[in-house]
Regions:
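Extracytoplasmic copper-binding redox domains, predominantly the cupredoxin/blue-copper superfamily
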Residues: 4, 8-104
Length: 104
């Protein structure tokens, strides 16, 4: 009985969306813009054209600055405060590999 009660009251991680880096062999994030709620988690996955990184402007705690070299490699980012979060792949920002996540 105690075990089932613990399962019921365990906090869950709120999943929101996936972002693909280098999707389809292009220097893009897909999607490059999305809207989520506070507490939601975004999974960022390296696509077909590595290496890439994921750097959130003014938020090093949300960033993954190390380059991901393996296709399919992924990590989760949880957004705990409302705001607009601009992100980019540092090596490919000049090619337009940028985006924004709106958290409300």
């Amino acid at each position: 009985m105690l075990i089932s009660a613990a399962v019921i009251f365990m906090p869950r991680m709120a999943y929101a969306a996936d972002i693909q880096m280098g999707s389809g062999g292009n220097l893009v994030f897909d999607p490059s813009e999305l809207s989520i709620s506070v507490g939601d988690t975004v999974t960022v996955t390296n696509g077909d054209l590595p290496p890439h990184n994921f750097v959130v402007a003014d938020h090093p705690e949300l960033s993954h600055p190390d380059l991901a070299f393996v296709g399919g490699e992924s990590f989760d980012v949880t957004f705990t405060e409302a705001g607009d979060y601009e992100f980019q792949c540092e090596p490919h920002a000049g090619a337009g590999m940028k985006g924004v996540i709106h958290v409300s």
